[in-house]
Amino acid sequence: MPFAEKKRRTYENAVKPLRKSRIYAPFRSIGHVSNAVPFDIEARGTHFLVTTSVGNTFQTYDCEKLNLLFVGKQLDKEITCLKSFKDFMLVAAGSKIFAYKRGKIIWDIDVEQEHGTVTHLDAFGEWIIACTSSRHVYVWKHASKYSVPELHTTFLPNTNADITSLLHPSTYLNKILLGFSDGALQIWNLRVSKRVHEFQEFFGDGITSLTQAPVLDVLAVGTISGRIVIFNLKNGSILMEFKQDGQVLSCSFRTDGTPILASSNPIGDLSFWDLSKRRIQNVTYNAHFGSLPKIQFLNGQPILVTAGPDNSLKEWIFDSMDGAPRILRSRNGHYEPPSFVKFYGKSVHFLISAATDRSLRAVSLYQDSQSTELSQGSVISKAKKLNVRPEELKLPEITALSSSNTREKYWDNVLTAHKNDSSARTWNWKSKTLGQHVLPTSDGTSVRSVCVSCCGNFGLIGSSKGVVDVYNMQSGIKRKSFGQSSLSGKPVTAVMLDNVNRILVTASLDGILKFWDFNKGNLIDSLDVGSSITHAIYQHSSDLVAVACDDFGIRIVDVQTRKIVRELWGHSNRLTSFDFSDTGRWLVTASLDGTIRTWDLPTGHLIDSISTPSVCTSLTFAPTGDYLATTHVDQVGISLWTNLSMFKHVSTKALRLDDVVEVSAPSVSGEKGISVVEAALNVESNAEDEEDISYRTMDQLDPNLQTLSKLPRTQWQTLINLEAIKARNAPKEVPKVPEKAPFFLPSLKDQSEATVPKQPIATEISKPTAVASIKVSGTEFSTLLHGNDDDAFFEYLKSLGPAKIDLEIRSLDAYPPYEEFILFINIMTRRLSKRRDFELVQACMSVFTKSHEDVLLMHDTPEDTVPVFESLKAWESVHKEENQRLLDLVGYCSGILSFMRT
């Protein structure tokens, strides 16, 4: 079929539009630590808790080990302020303030929407204060922890300058300080809503931060010009003044007895000032990648906590002789959106992710503290010596990655290609460090693709001019090269090797897929797919290669036959990533058109299509099939989606190409998401899939096909051999009579004789009369046998056990005129002629002939047995005909198979 027709292909049996995704449900987003919103530290006795904002929710860590304690409930808008207050965590988002307790919302208050969003938040005593973007100040009074705060007052300072900082000075009853962008500092009384005093001439520049000193009436005022003013609030005098590079974003006083003041600037530097000597002590450059909106010393400890929009939270300890801090512990993630993600190994414990921030990270799905960045050496110390930023000394951005966990304990097992770099780098996963080998291309051009063999011994790199070099991962020695004799001059966009290192598959931008003998090094075959290949992946369990092309199509190639077996069309823009499912049955693709589509490869149908808020840049399917992990252009985290097909039936009916479901991305808290346990216990089905789920297999596909009863094999085998089984299970010895008990202990025999009354001996009745009395009531077996519904009879027969069926057959009326014999033989003959329940019919007739053989042969008069023998002859005729038909078919198939084997 021409490509144009395939692009226009529609499915006549496509179902109606979906309301939600069939396969995927958002689970949670991982890899988030902090953003530009200032954090909050809460003292709980001798322990400290630090809370950071991550978009629409917050995370709380224990400062002792930086373990993640809990995540707050997701909000509709992004968080702007955090403040701990009594047992609550106050969170401002938009025009509302929410009170959380252990991650759950207890109550909320709000400001008028026309006054803008909340920009500053503070709380002390019974007061809660919020400043808005329109310079309005709201004051609430919180009477008790069980009540919702009541609005006390609202006031608007008489100035056109914006409020830039808010602080409650210690011991100043009902007072707050407001810092403004024009350099003014005002004291306000909350109870009467009046300005008490204003300091205008002391600072000049706009105030950016206010920090309370350990000494009463003293605070540090930071300005936009970099001035740090130590100001006495009581007498309105400047005690000392410092000047740093860049504006002052935050200040903090050390409270363990050492007179040190720390300050931060927008480029991530930390400055430490000796207050006793009134000079700078040292500067820590590039403490963070980007600004530091807040820094704070832990009360009474030489530990400084910092966090910023570089998605990192750090604790610095001052234990060196020169007073310079060192990192005590930290939690961090990518500070730029990841561009590549892949599950490591055969489990879902770790993800490997790479981003444009030039870092390679191991992200744990089990515990946040296990996530770490793979070290690139002493980058920070080298940056200090060269006076450059650390990211400038890191390796270029990673463009391709491959790994194998087979030899991870012995040598490097991760291989990466870097942007505009002519060498690939090895990494050691066990030590989480950069490896010792640098693998250059033989033609000197940049590396475009990499591959690590399944055995972990070989690393393959594809160059920009069509050459593939093979290196030993243990020694870093080059072993062979492919492509010099048939140099295409086009970049090798994918290098793939099968499980046993027998066939090497390469893809290039000229649209040629080449198959090489890996051991001999010669070209076996090549396949032109008709369009430039941008990427390709190998599915080892099924020997399939998926190829993404410039014409927005995906081709599925069988490595054994070297032919295109499927072509998938539906994306309207370039493909960014794709991956096979764990079973190889599905292919999940992502494109710049904003959709993630799932294709069923056996049928070639589109079975799921979702649209995410931002474009997916990379995706990977879990080796266990539990999750789908995705990265997006505007998110520093990694999104996890639960695979619902692990816990319920998923319809594979074709969808229309324009049937796309808009879904929300997974949240950090997992709010409105479906976990693996929830998916297993409570999963709702789509309405359009109910019909497909309730489908039942037909009783018989075709009248010419022999159909079995679908009973377990042991059931009809036991029925045939029931007498032998009973004989085998019979006791070999006669039960022994128990010894006579002492005279003072009654025996069981005595008890039974004493308790069970003797029944009168019944008078002997004739055998025909006894049988007649039994047949009066009848059984369900006998009732259905006398009826006209063969299907109902066999359904009841299938519900019985082997012993019950044997008993019912033996209980057939064995006296002239043998009516039940005739009915039983006839119903079995009709069932056999319909070619249904073949093995059950054979087993029942075998039991019937064995059980009643003596009755059929020892008859009284010929007239009584004529109808029975006529029924048996009819059975014999049908039985011989059907057996001969089956023998002919089996013989034919056996002959064909023997011919094909030879």
UniProtKB/Swiss-Prot annotation:
GO terms for cellular component: cell division site; cytosol; mitotic spindle; nucleus; Pwp2p-containing subcomplex of 90S preribosome; small-subunit processome. InterPro entries: SSU_processome_Utp21, WD40/YVTN_repeat-like_dom_sf, WD40_repeat_CS, WD40_repeat_dom_sf, WD40_rpt. It is found in: Nucleus, Nucleolus. Keywords: Nucleus, Repeat, Ribonucleoprotein, Ribosome biogenesis, WD repeat. WD repeats lie at residues 40-71, 80-110, 119-154, 164-198, 206-243, 249-284, 289-332, 339-373, 399-438, 447-481, 492-528, 533-568, 570-611, 613-651. It comes from the Eukaryota. GO terms for biological process: rRNA processing. The keyword Cytoplasm does not apply. PANTHER family: WD REPEAT-CONTAINING PROTEIN 36. Interacts with snoRNA U3. Interacts with MPP10. Component of the ribosomal small subunit (SSU) processome composed of at least 40 protein subunits and snoRNA U3. The WD repeats are grouped into two tandem seven-bladed beta-propeller regions. Involved in nucleolar processing of pre-18S ribosomal RNA and ribosome assembly. This is U3 small nucleolar RNA-associated protein 21 homolog.
